[in-house]
Amino acid sequence: QEVDRDYSAAISNTIIPRAWIEAAVNAHFRIPWKDKNGELCIGFRPDQIPNIHGAGLDVADEGIDRNASALKQWIILRGVDEWGERDPGVTARRAMANFRQIKGIKVQYDCIGIGSNVKSEFNRLIESGDITIDEIMMIPWNAGDAVQEPFAHIVPDDEESLLNKDFFQNMKAQAWWSIRTRFFKTWKTLQSLDAYLKDGTPIEFYDPEELISLDGSIPLIKQLIKELAQPTGGPGASLRMVVNKKPKDTKSPNLADAVVMAYFPAIDDYGNVSVGSYGA
């Protein structure tokens, strides 16, 4: 299978090309895959989509920054939300109220700065009995943390590719690269599907678990596409990849940050380790 190995180009400009993002809109209706009998299937029916959910919460930090949340079902982004609120306690309650209907959901939340207060509000609600961890779990997500699986290659099973610890400065860079890889593979498999339907060219299949689809009915879809295509990457002082989320004259991509957290779970407080796809 072809893999995206243009590392230098990827980290010297926009991390995710807009064309890849646009291709992922409603991709779950067109993703090619094979059933257990090896038969070609195109797209997923509602009953074929796993009822597995996850969420991300980006907490407003300062100035005109806004809070944002993202909800995904399996590989499909089902919704995003954005609102202004300076009190992290109110923000935490809003997010928990929105997500608690999905029993057992894990919400990855930005725990840096003001976001650190989210866990305090969560613990207060647990202690008061207003919610339980069977309903919802809040998982701190620290963008500055060390990379996950540091000694794994950024392209699994490709020993020529760099190790995670040598390529990424921190978990933020790793997470953005991870979602970039999802968009790349989604775009690639859909391109190959079009070629197959046109002239029979073999399809480039990927495990659907490694892909991404953006529900086209999301009200803020245009803003989300713009935000996902905004961050740039480049080598930091240690020559490892760093992410610049706010190039000159741009606003913080809050929706995109929430989406990245939802698709790249951190090690949680409940004895579980959930790692995202780096390009597997």
Q: Which role fits each region the language model picked out?
A:
Residues 1-6, 14-20, 34-38, 191-212, ...:
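Short coil/turn segments at secondary-structure boundaries
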Residues 1-57:
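ATPase catalytic-site recognition across NTP-hydrolyzing enzymes
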Residues 3, 179, 258:
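A residue-level signal for conserved active-site and pocket-lining positions in enzyme catalytic cores
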Residues 48-73:
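Gly/Thr-rich phosphate-binding beta-strand-loop-beta motif of the actin/hexokinase/Hsp70
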Residues 58, 110, 254-257:
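Acidic active-site catalytic centers that drive phospho-/nucleotidyl reactions
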Residues 72, 228-267:
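Extracellular low-complexity, Gly/Ser/Thr-rich intrinsically disordered linkers
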Residues 73-238, 275-280:
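Mg2+-dependent endonuclease catalytic cores in nucleic-acid-processing enzymes, primarily RNase H-like
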Residues 245, 269-280:
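Enriched but not universal
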